[in-house]
Amino acid sequence: MDKNNNNLRLILAIALSFLFIALYSYFFQKPNKTTTQTTKQETTNNHTATSPNAPNAQHFSTTQTTPQENLLSTISFEHARIEIDSLGRIKQVYLKDKKYLTPKQKGFLEHVGHLFSSKENAQPPLKELPLLAADKLKPLEVRFLDPTLNNKAFNTPYSASKTTLGPNEQLVLTQDLGTLSIIKTLTFYDDLHYDLKIAFKSPNNLIPSYVITNGYRPVADLDSYTFSGVLLENSDKKIEKIEDKDAKEIKRFSNTLFLSSVDRYFTTLLFTKDPQGFEALIDSEIGTKNPLGFISLKNEANLHGYIGPKDYRSLKAISPMLTDVIEYGLITFFAKGVFVLLDYLYQFVGNWGWAIILLTIIVRIILYPLSYKGMVSMQKLKELAPKMKELQEKYKGEPQKLQAHMMQLYKKHGANPLGGCLPLILQIPVFFAIYRVLYNAVELKSSEWILWIHDLSIMDPYFILPLLMGASMYWHQSVTPNTMTDPMQAKIFKLLPLLFTIFLITFPAGLVLYWTTNNILSVLQQLIINKVLENKKRMHAQNKKEH
């Protein structure tokens, strides 16, 4: 039984190692793929007719590009700039806040090469960060289901009430299509959310069926391997996700409250305050099968939008439901609570690094009762190791008798052979929740901690934290009771600190800080428990001697 327990602990440790390998490969290895970018001419040549009730992303394309290339209006903010083109679309959004202007992180080998090179390693910051791709579907593009009307709309530029404006100012965009006029009224705010009203004028007051899009997802974080695609939520709070390359057919969603296109840090979205929601259509981009979102409309519309960072507090201030745009995978329900706690701690200490350390301390306190039981159990197993070895020798070749006597021994001394594994198992979901939070949180981008850590969202530039993590893990092993009787298992366990150091060396510094702090707290906790158990053992021996 003891051997089985040791095997289980070894399997868990190795499983964790392989999970780290998988994470490393998934998040940090660049896949061998090329992005297919369909030119306007290719789009025209490959055009196929589709049902007018199910508009394809390329269904309304046109080779007339002159109006699309003209800049119509510019909205300027303190930390951003938005451009509107001649088709009444958001042509580009530029962020000017310095936290988004740090240069792209180098790959591991390139970084190491520069680290040991005499050449200047610093890269100049960006002047501004564009969020949208130049050749992709633009937010606020209107498409009509009538092909003739749609073609005319794509060749007729809008007029604007203003060419330059600031936050809280109203912009009226008008497109005259002869018997029909479209009026878009826009008001942009400092937090990058906006109000949108779509109205029509026609002699017969008839409004043709049309769609409007929130646009193709931002492309400011192309090397990220977190969720990228379309995410929407309906009135029942059910969230639907369509990832890049997975849009294989047109999908319809009724009672939709918000429609968003996201990458790791940024989003472009449309939402409504009407509890009945709207009908959303998810189509596929030709060539890539990346999802494209549309809202199907038959009347005039009052909508709201946002385009910018997935900052939790900003989104919550606009509308609490928009915080669901921040996606953490299968453990979102748990990870969101972790982030809320982390954000609260940040508000308290004013530094994300110290907030991570406080979060780690809180997690250790919550898990302390189970950790204590596990450590006590491991200490008891260590003390029973000589007796267990005797039983293994005595009942060699008789596994059933050996197991029965082992269980009697455990019961007599109150030892739990699985007690040391439980804390390790419980830390797995906690670790992955914290991992997703620290990797996805745009709040950590360009966030300093101390000294050499100037950005907690990227790897430690000098690999000091990963080395400290490995050393702390080895230290933890040295103070933890060793219940292994198999020399090979013991050798494998000794290699784990080195293995984890290699896996974590390119992980975000914030995550490595959490793991290092967790190891140090585990060591301190183990030393305290060892001292407590030693005192109890001494007192027990003294009482036994007196009697």
From Swiss-Prot:
Gene Ontology biological-process annotations: protein insertion into membrane; protein transport
Chief place of localization: membrane
Membrane-spanning ranges: 8-28, 325-345, 348-368, 414-434, 449-469, 495-515
GO terms for cellular component: plasma membrane
Gene3D superfamilies on file: 2.70.98.90
Membrane topology value: Multi-pass membrane protein
GO MF annotation terms: membrane insertase activity
UniProt key word Chaperone: yes
Biased composition (Polar residues): 51-62
Region (Disordered) location: 37-62
Compartment(s) where it occurs, according to its Swiss-Prot or TrEMBL record: Cell inner membrane
Keywords associated with the record: Cell inner membrane, Cell membrane, Chaperone, Membrane, Protein transport, Transmembrane, Transmembrane helix, Transport
Family affiliation: Belongs to the OXA1/ALB3/YidC family. Type 1 subfamily.
Role summary: Required for the insertion and/or proper folding and/or complex formation of integral membrane proteins into the membrane. Involved in integration of membrane proteins that insert both dependently and independently of the Sec translocase complex, as well as at least some lipoproteins. Aids folding of multispanning membrane proteins.
Subunit structure: Interacts with the Sec translocase complex via SecD. Specifically interacts with transmembrane segments of nascent integral membrane proteins during membrane integration.
Name of this chain's protein: Membrane protein insertase YidC
